[in-house]
Structures are given as structure tokens and as C-alpha cells.
Amino acid sequence: MTQLTHINAAGEAHMVDVSAKAETVREARAEAFVEMLPTTLAMIIEGSHHKGDVFATARIAGIQAAKRTWELIPLCHPLMLSKVEVQLEAQPEHSRVRIETCCRLTGKTGVEMEALTAASVAALTIYDMCKAVQKDMVIGPVRLLAKSGGKSGDFKVEL
């Protein structure tokens, strides 16, 4: 079984020392979904929401969240991200929005948490902007789709 890297020999939480690790190109992709009523989704698609462009706001929120992940997740390292991409796709056939994020850097630690945080905060932003018209929207699942680079190797979800 793989050891938990954020727990020291005494069983205490600590930030992992990455100073001896090699810098490599690292990338991670994540996704999140927001399920809603067809009328709520139509309002987003048509751009008729009274608060403005829901997708543009969620995209910016996701990008900002990726950049601030280290402030939200206690043991994450502050990272110099070279790329943050947030794509939003209305899926009327499922009455939902799909969010896919991609984060990249050249560094000593991975960007999985940044990609997951970007997807999560973009989903929360959609909820926040639309809660006045629908409070029972469902967020989820949120998951890591892929990661590459680093000592632990590559990972990709089987779709």
C-alpha cells in the first residue's frame, strides 16, 4: 500500500518537502457537473440570466480558484501555474453543465488539486448565480480525469 505523503513518522500532518525533486512538466485535468432543470439550463444558454454571463463568470472563478488552491487546501504548495483552462459545456440532453479544467506547470509537485479546485469552484459559481431560480441543483460528481508528469507516473480515467 502507498504511504500517505502528508503524514510524518509521528502521525502528524506536514507539508511534503519537494526541494530534492526534479522539475518536470506536470498537467492535470478534472471535471465537475451541475445538474439543473431544463428551464434553468435554457436561461444560461440563452444568456437571459439577470446576473449576466454565467459561463464567463464561472470560467474566471475557476481560473482564480486554481491560482489560490494553496490558500484553501492547507498542505498544498503555492505553485507557479503556466496554464489554467476552464471549459464549460451545456448538455441539454442530460439537463446539466459539464466543466472540464486543465492545469499545467513545470515544477516539483503536481497540479491535481488545482484542477479539482478549479472545477469545483466553477460549479459552485454556477450554483451561486442560479440559486435564485433553482435551489435544488446538484453538483457532482467531481473527479480527476488525468494527470501526467512526476515520479508517481501518469493516470487516466477509463471512460
From Swiss-Prot:
Record's catalysed reaction(s): (8S)-3',8-cyclo-7,8-dihydroguanosine 5'-triphosphate = cyclic pyranopterin phosphate + diphosphate
Catalytic residues of the enzyme: 128
Residues reported in the UniProt entry to bind substrate: 75-77, 113-114
Keyword Transport applies: no
GO biological process: Mo-molybdopterin cofactor biosynthetic process
Subunit relationships: Homohexamer; trimer of dimers.
Name of the protein this chain belongs to: Cyclic pyranopterin monophosphate synthase
Gene symbol of the encoding locus: moaC
